[in-house]
Regions:
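Short beta-strand/loop motif that positions the catalytic acidic residue
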Residues: 84, 90-92, 96
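Acidic catalytic loop of the alpha/beta-hydrolase fold
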Residues: 58, 95-99, 127
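Generic recognition of short, well-ordered alpha-helical segments
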Residues: 15, 102-103, 132, 136
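Short alpha-helix in the alpha/beta-hydrolase fold that links the catalytic acid
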Residues: 86, 100-110
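Active-site nucleophile elbow and catalytic-triad environment of alpha/beta-hydrolase enzymes
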Residues: 62-80
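Catalytic active-site module of serine/aspartate enzymes centered on a nucleophile-bearing elbow/loop
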Residues: 115-152
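Alpha/beta-hydrolase-fold enzymes
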Residues: 1-62
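Conserved hydrophobic packing residues within short motifs/helices of P-loop NTPase cores
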Residues: 1, 89-91, 119
Length: 152
């Protein structure tokens, strides 16, 4: 199960920034590369407020090395996705600005498992289980788990 996975760079990220990020991560790994706006997590203002108030959530910028490692992981996942043979569920909000919904589409189309499900929640933000349609998302997740759990 993959919930709004980071499988492709965002379409709004300039290509020069992607190329430069690897260089910066080597020479200045702690460089504060990008800040994540909590307002992009959910359309539910209570979820956004809870995130901003949570002392256990990192509110600083993502270091350049972390960003470069995520980009490298994306490439490894893309190269190996056709070897995956277990049941796969991917779900993503179509208005996610933190991770790219097109990455989930491409992964869903290219994964090797014949048992694959891609669900896109129209208008949904990054945290689909904490967004406005959370009940629908959770119900679909539970139904998928029941369909894939061994009978006992």
């Amino acid at each position: 199960m993959l919930s709004s996975p980071a499988l492709a760079p965002g379409r709004d990220v300039p290509r020069w920034m992607l190329a430069l990020s690897r260089f910066i991560s080597r020479v200045w790994p702690t460089f504060p590369a990008i800040r994540i706006d909590a307002a992009l997590l959910s359309r539910d203002p209570a979820v956004v407020a809870a995130n901003r108030a949570d002392p256990l959530v990192h509110h600083g910028a993502v270091p350049a090395r972390t960003g470069a490692e995520i980009l490298d992981a994306m490439a490894r996942i893309e190269r190996g996705r056709d070897t995956l043979r277990v049941p796969v569920l991917v779900y993503h909000g179509t208005e996610d600005k933190l991770t790219e919904p097109d990455g989930s589409r491409a992964f869903g189309a290219g994964v090797g498992s014949p048992d694959r499900t891609l669900t896109l929640y129209e208008g949904g933000f990054h945290e689909t289980m904490n967004d406005l349609e959370r009940d629908r998302v959770i119900d679909a997740l539970i139904a998928w788990l029941h369909a894939h759990a061994p009978a006992h």
